[in-house]
Amino acid sequence: MEQTLSIIKPDSVGKAHIGEIIAIFEKSGLRIAAMKMVHLSVKEAEGFYVVHKERPFFQELVDFMISGPVVVMVLQGENAVARNRELMGATNPKEAAEGSIRALFGESIGVNAVHGSDSLENAAIEVSYFFAKTEVVNSVA
């Protein structure tokens, strides 16, 4: 079973969309193997998004991600990375498929409701950034 990291971003947490987003994941067959709500520090946000450090949007992304609490989850299931990315939709909500999380809850390319790992390799790195191995439960019976 694959695992991937999902973050419900401050905009969706603030608008009380947590339950709706989790329902989309669960209805698609993805299971939650770990979950917690955190308010990221500047250091944590910069560390998580270090791959974007040289990009022009980096500081705006960090500022947004520390603007309120986020819900960090490990999703598990067959093809979890690809399924999560399909459920999220395109980064820009205006280009996201109808019914996708970003089409439903995203506002803009920067304020786009959720983050999801883009590869199995990055999923492993991202999961370990937020969770110890003992915090991740095999949720598939």
Swiss-Prot record:
Q: Which keywords does this Swiss-Prot/TrEMBL entry list? A: ATP-binding, Cytoplasm, Kinase, Magnesium, Metal-binding, Nucleotide metabolism, Nucleotide-binding, Phosphoprotein, Transferase
| Active-site residues, as the UniProt record annotates them | 115
Cofactor names:
Mg(2+)
Q: Where in the cell is it found?
A: Cytoplasm
E.C. no: 2.7.4.6
Tell me which residues bind ATP.
9, 57, 85, 91, 102, 112
Q: Name one GO biological process term.
A: CTP biosynthetic process
Q: Which SMART domains match?
A: NDK
Which reaction(s) are listed as its catalytic activity? a 2'-deoxyribonucleoside 5'-diphosphate + ATP = a 2'-deoxyribonucleoside 5'-triphosphate + ADP; a ribonucleoside 5'-diphosphate + ATP = a ribonucleoside 5'-triphosphate + ADP
- What are its GO cellular component terms? cytoplasm
Gene Ontology terms for molecular function: ATP binding; metal ion binding; nucleoside diphosphate kinase activity
PANTHER family to which the protein is assigned, alphabetical: NUCLEOSIDE DIPHOSPHATE KINASE, NUCLEOSIDE DIPHOSPHATE KINASE DDB_G0292928-RELATED
Protein name (Swiss-Prot/TrEMBL)? Nucleoside diphosphate kinase
State the organism named in the record: Chlamydia trachomatis serovar L2 (strain ATCC VR-902B / DSM 19102 / 434/Bu)
